[in-house]
Amino acid sequence: MDDVTDAERPPRRGAILVLEDRDDVRQGMAQLLELHGFLVVDAAAGEQALDHLRADPDGFALLLLDLRMPGPVDGRDVRRSQLKSPDLADIPTVVVTATVPDGITKAQLRADAWIEKPFRFDDLLLVVRQYVTPNT
């Protein structure tokens, strides 16, 4: 039933936060999304992503989240913090990862969608358009 509710939820307006530690992947995703009319904010580390989210919780329409990140705050930590915060919990989150976690972790993260790396840009755009209205 929850999937039906999610499918009926209209796309949101706002920026897409791309959290990805690899510069080439993060920049490629940002450029692709910007070319298709989306506003993008990117972060290379978990702490930076949380700073962006906390600074403007209403400004984000979607979080594209890589789980494996170097440093003290990885993607799982970002998602846990997001779910604990009433201001951030309702921001749709799509996990973009090369390693799909076990069922328990996956259930705990409660992501709206999952995209497995490597992915096709068309597949990414298809998922993003379910949640975000382009700014054009």
Model-derived features: positions:
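Non-catalytic signal-transmission and effector/linker regions of two-component phosphorelay proteins
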Residues: 1-17, 23, 120-136
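Acidic, metal-coordinating helix/loop segments flanking the phosphotransfer/catalytic sites
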Residues: 42-62
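Short amphipathic alpha-helix used as the core "switch/output" element in two-component signaling
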Residues: 51, 74-89
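His-Asp phosphorelay/catalytic-motif detector in bacterial-type signaling
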Residues: 58-61, 86-92
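Active-site residues of response regulator receiver
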Residues: 66-68
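Hydrophobic/aromatic residues positioned on beta-strands within the core alpha/beta folds
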Residues: 94-96
